[in-house]
Design a protein with these regions (language model features):
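Conserved HxN/HPN-centered segment at the entrance to the catalytic loop
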Residues: 116-124
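AlphaC helix of the protein kinase catalytic domain
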Residues: 145-154
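Conserved protein kinase catalytic/activation segment
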Residues: 187-203
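Conserved activation segment of eukaryotic-like protein kinases, specifically the C-terminal portion
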Residues: 216-232
């Protein structure tokens, strides 16, 4: 606020004795050096249309665009002092064609904020005001599976551990009649040696991976999105479902074991090529994959949705039986 800025200016003049409040650059430099303002906050204030730096009980302190993508920022709860991740949009952001065609849903975000689980990211609030829309979640420590796989495939044992956690997360969503709709190596994070967690999009309703207006708060390369698209999405009007989530889990599992996208010629496929691949081509698995694991994956990626696991609970039981499969 202006009152706060004036207070900071008086504090600086009192402590240095030679800073004029008219010297904007010097004042800005000193505010940054004394921790009163971050470089990100200063740059935001200097934009032609400044983005809000205070949203309800939260203060926006830095960008997370390099880590998480466009519109992601780091926030601090001014009452608790905790650091959070925030996805935020201004009115201008929401005028983009993709958002106008498929707008965020505040009701969906409120639903997600009521659902918690040890293997799920935790969304705590959504703020919708005339000039902005923002969602806040606890920050995750670790790295996405996509980054982990750039160093090589997971061991069978580690992949089973990943699946136990992610299936637990998906079961928690499905039990509340929520579909994830964006399961890829970008949405699964390894947070410690023994724990994987699932990131979710709490505010943009799921839609077909082939949709021209597809959008998600989880920044996802198109190739990963298409690689996990269930065969039924080739039919017009097909919406994400529990079965398409299970299919995507199977593709991600195979991806983790191979260390690459588990479909032939994946780097050369266009949209029609991807649709034919999911309808006709068997998924690739490493030759060393134990048969019980391979059997689980094949059930998950069955071309016919009715041939897959019935639900996440049935899949969880199958994974629990894999002890010693490595």
């Amino acid at each position: 606020s202006q009152d706060t800025c004036r207070t900071w200016a008086r504090e600086l003049m009192s402590s240095t004795g030679n800073v004029s409040p008219d010297d904007a650059m010097q004042l800005a430099t000193d505010l940054i050096h004394t921790g009163k303002l971050t470089t990100f906050q200063l740059n935001s204030l200097l934009e032609p249309i400044p983005r809000p730096l205070a949203l309800g009980p939260y203060r926006i302190v830095d960008t997370l665009s390099d880590l998480l993508g466009l519109n992601w920022v780091q926030a601090t709860d001014i009452h608790r002092g905790t650091s959070l991740w925030c996805i935020q949009w201004t009115r201008d952001d929401l005028q983009r064609p993709s958002y106008k065609a498929w707008p965020p849903s505040v009701d969906l975000a409120k639903h997600h904020s009521r659902i918690d689980g040890p293997a799920l990211d935790r969304w705590e609030s959504v703020l919708a005001e005339p000039g902005y829309l923002a969602c806040f979640c606890e920050s995750l420590h670790g790295q996405p599976l996509s980054q982990l796989l750039s160093q090589g495939p997971l061991s069978v044992e580690s992949s089973i551990r990943m699946m136990r956690d992610t299936v637990s997360a998906i079961a928690g969503l499905h039990d509340q009649d929520l579909i994830h709709g964006a399961i890829t190596p970008e949405s699964i994070w390894k947070c410690s040696e023994d724990q994987f967690r699932m990131r979710r999009d709490p505010i943009i309703p799921p839609q077909s991976p082939y949709s021209a207006s597809w959008n998600s708060v989880i920044t996802t390369p198109e190739i990963l999105r298409h690689a996990t698209a269930a065969p039924e999405f080739t039919l017009p009007g097909t919406e994400p479902s529990r079965q398409s989530d299970l299919y995507a889990l199977g593709v991600v599992w195979a991806h983790a074991l191979l260390g690459r996208i588990p479909w032939p010629k994946s780097d050369r496929l266009d949209t029609n090529g991807w649709k034919k691949t999911h309808q006709q081509v068997p998924i690739e698995l490493p030759a060393s994959c134990p048969e019980p694991v391979a059997r689980c994956i094949r059930y998950l990626v069955a071309k016919n949705p009715s041939s897959r696991f019935r639900d996440a609970s049935q899949l969880a039981k199958a994974i629990a039986s894999l002890d010693g499969a490595s």
